[in-house]
Design a protein with these regions (language model features):
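Extracellular/periplasmic catalytic domains that process cell-envelope and extracellular macromolecules
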Residues: 179-180, 270-273, 343-347
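A Trp-anchored, charged/polar loop motif used as the substrate-binding/catalytic surface
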Residues: 324-342, 432-442
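Short aromatic-enriched loop/helix-cap "lid" or pocket-rim segments at secondary-structure transitions
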Residues: 199-200, 288-294, 362-367
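C-terminal catalytic-base region of ester-bond hydrolases, centering on the histidine
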Residues: 32, 99-106, 130-137, 345-443
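Active-site catalytic motif of lipid deacylating hydrolases and related acyltransferases
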Residues: 177-249
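Serine-dependent carboxylesterase/thioesterase catalytic core
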Residues: 2-10, 20-31, 189, 216, ...
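Flexible, membrane-associating and regulatory peripheral segments of lipid-active enzymes
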Residues: 1-198
């Protein structure tokens, strides 16, 4: 909304708020009735359609409308406060008129404000659980409620601006089909997750790639099992894709342990003829030394107990034969050294890797914040909360992602696990660029 549009809207809202005070200046009853009717219709229009926007997503339209309504209520409240201070101390306006006008104004402002807050509360994808709970529980605390209000406003504004940038980028490049690669994309998840329909491991990334022309498949392998077992499942997935589509090959995008699983499928299970490229993201190619130390210090009975509980849960969630301990052991530096000894890179497969790092323990929530500290304490250096950056390098090194600011990018952020926009890092743009470069290489 432009400055002129906002100013015009605020002007007519102020006329409505002070209609009781302005009525004596309108001796003609018909003029008063028409003015009241017109301003009330305008007020209702503001509630229903608070902003005109070119945004194509209905949720974002509602969200941005909420931002504009809250902003309008704040600005007009401040103006109204200044007007009342002037009327009380500098004029002889009857108290009865001031009180009546004030009550009507307060009701109208409250309704405008609440409409805006409800829109933001229900439609923002970036607010998060804790901010919503904080508002519900602590809205009445002076000072803190203003802090929450400012946070709500900032989050909603940035979310809308970010989404509009994505929309404009797509409209500019949609004819180019930036991600329409020669071979389809096979996305391979990491450990302790599955490819669920109702919760995509890769967040908003697949939809963005598809918008730019990509063809996406998912590996659908076990959430936790040995590298060998997961690789067998990935092999079966690749062969099925090739058979069903006739594509000949696939481009693998693998995160975390999925990178090890994919490498094994290509190097040891004969999939080099069916894979054009492998891109690993935050994969522990040389293992996680802290996993080995932790397993050596924890009671085997306790590890088995946790494993049984995990396997029971994930069997219910879709795994056919999960193996908690085997999956975990293959992340140790000892096992990765063994695997690297047998996983010889296939000459016909383009291999590249990239990673990310957290700025501090505050960059992510549990358990990544704890993992970050453990890795640092044990001498692992810079890491993403699970994997040291030195362990992420394999093949053509694309480097470590380092956005501006102190937050950094965690093991979950790099796959958009929390769907949070990170200042200085466009996760969807990162993958779009990654796939586009594969397209340019002829893959």
């Amino acid at each position: 909304m432009t400055y002129i549009e906002r100013t015009t809207r605020y002007f007519f809202l102020m006329l409505l708020y002070n209609l009781v005070l302005l009525s004596p200046m309108m001796p003609d009853k018909l003029i008063r009735v028409l003015s009241c009717t017109g301003l009330m219709l305008f007020y209702l229009y503001c509630h229903i359609k608070p902003v005109n926007t070119s945004c194509k997503e209905q949720r974002l339209k509602i969200l941005h409308g909420g931002y504009e309504l809250v902003l309008a209520s704040i600005v007009t409240f401040l103006i109204e406060t200044a007007i009342y201070l002037f009327l009380i101390f500098k004029t002889t306006t009857p108290a009865r008129l001031l009180i009546m006008n004030g009550i009507i104004c307060a009701i109208l402002l409250y309704l405008l404000f609440m409409n805006g807050i409800i829109r933001i509360f229900t439609c923002s994808g970036q607010l998060g659980f804790f901010k919503r709970i904080a508002l519900l529980l602590f809205w009445w605390i002076p000072g803190f409620n203003l802090f929450l209000l400012h946070s709500f406003m900032e989050v909603s504004r940035k979310e809308y601006d970010f989404s509009m940038e994505k929309q404009q980028f797509y409209e500019k490049w949609k004819e180019e089909e930036l991600c329409k690669t020669k071979y389809p994309i096979l996305m391979v998840h990491g450990i302790f997750f599955r490819d669920w329909k109702n919760f995509n491991y890769w967040g908003r990334i697949p939809d963005e790639l598809i918008r730019h022309g990509a063809t996406i498949f998912y590996s659908n392998h076990q959430s936790s099992a040995s590298v060998e077992q997961c690789a067998e499942e990935i092999k079966a997935c690749i062969l099925k894709i090739v058979k069903d589509t006739g594509c000949g090959k696939v481009n693998i995008i693998a995160h975390s342990k999925g990178g090890l699983d994919s490498r094994y499928a290509v190097s040891c299970l004969g999939m080099d003829g069916y894979v054009a490229s492998i891109t690993t993201i935050n994969t522990p190619h040389y293992g996680c030394n802290y996993v080995c130390r932790i397993l050596d210090r924890i009671s085997p009975e306790f590890v088995k107990f946790i494993g049984k509980k995990y396997e029971s849960l994930f069997t219910l969630l879709g795994d056919e034969n999960p193996d908690f301990l085997s999956g975990l052991r293959d992340l140790t530096d000892r096992e990765c050294a063994r695997l690297n000894g047998v996983m010889t890179d296939a000459p016909g497969v383009y291999c590249q890797s990239t990673g990310s790092q957290m700025g501090s323990a505050k960059s992510a929530m549990f358990p990544l914040n704890l993992g970050y500290l453990i890795i640092r304490i044990l001498g692992g250096g810079k890491n993403d909360g699970l994997v040291s950056t030195s362990s992420m390098v394999w093949g053509n090194d694309l480097g470590v992602l380092k956005p501006k600011g102190k937050q950094g990018i965690s093991h979950g952020d790099v796959i958009d696990l929390t769907r949070k926009n990170i200042e200085g890092f466009d996760v969807m743009g990162f993958y779009t660029d990654l796939i586009h470069k594969l397209k340019e290489r002829g893959y």
